[in-house]
């Protein structure tokens, strides 16, 4: 195992960069400066990646270094280059506009950077502490803006970056959109902390996170998210807690596959009959019509400085509102397959890492467990909400894969 040590001053710089990347990636800065904090988060993620790549070059095996340096460069670079090229060729758009419009994918470099740094001396416990501190800061940040922002004025603002922060319906009124992924992971992890608290401070912190997350949910009341979380909590002890339980899942898989059309039809009807369902139905039809002739690479990545999807398709058309169909619209069948592969890869790595940590330490890692449960919940809602294709999901996915892979290296037999 590599045993390089980080100087104290460099360690604190790394942890600070990690906080910025996570806070911005989970969209904590979207409430001010038109989310310009995201650019700082991207720069922080790239800095961590370059530093990890530099240290790994001297301390890691060549095969491992290539996998965690060249692999992410080819994957992220390929997504950005291909999607920008496709859009610019089909609609005479500016390549650079589309390329930089996809810059949120650069947040994916955070995970490889953290993995490489942990493999070359950064204590993984420091990473966990920064993640929990960031989750807590995101919750406090959200509540501050919820209590101080004029939500009605923001909702009717002519500035799209401001109006997009608030949603409204007659039942729940005006609601400020939260950093949902981080809050749900915090809620799940805090639950595990309460049940296996390893000290008074951990117990108090877990209760504080639970209280904040519960209060935020009482504001936003995202029922579909809560339903999938509860379903994931039910599935975990039945199918995912032990390797032997997975055999039961394999036995039941034919029945589950047979029930998919019924479940999908019910979910689709609920999706379309909800508020705005008529617009979603037209958006679905427009996407399917487009994919008939552009099924391989899709439409590519649009930008705010040229023709957008609303100019090309319809004013009401937003791919992010129509689930996996929207992903296929943007990136084609190739992008859709790549998305499903990455989703499965992250989920499987988290499952293995959770078993590994529990077998090695005798208890659960609350963060790994929470990430596994959230990915399981995302799987149930995958068709309608492919969240890993956007900033919050990219940040969560890359962090989850890095932590899971690092845990698996800890449990691997020494060569």
Named regions from a protein language model:
Residues 333-379, 405-406, 410:
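Hydrophobic transmembrane alpha-helices and their immediate junctions
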Residues 68-81, 92-117, 129-135, 139:
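Aromatic-anchored transmembrane helix interface
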Residues 128-153, 172-221, 226-239:
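Alpha-helical transmembrane segments of multi-pass inner-membrane proteins
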Residues 220, 237-275, 288-293:
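A membrane-periplasm/extracellular boundary helix in multi-pass inner-membrane enzymes
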Residues 266, 270-331, 352-358:
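Long extracytoplasmic/lumenal interhelical loops at the membrane interface
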Residues 1-85, 122-125, 195-201, 352, ...:
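Transmembrane signal-anchor hairpin modules in multi-pass inner-membrane enzymes, especially those
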Residues 85-93, 125, 139-180, 312:
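Membrane-interfacial helix-loop-helix modules of multi-pass inner-membrane proteins that assemble, modify
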Residues 370-415:
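Transmembrane alpha-helices of multi-pass inner-membrane enzymes
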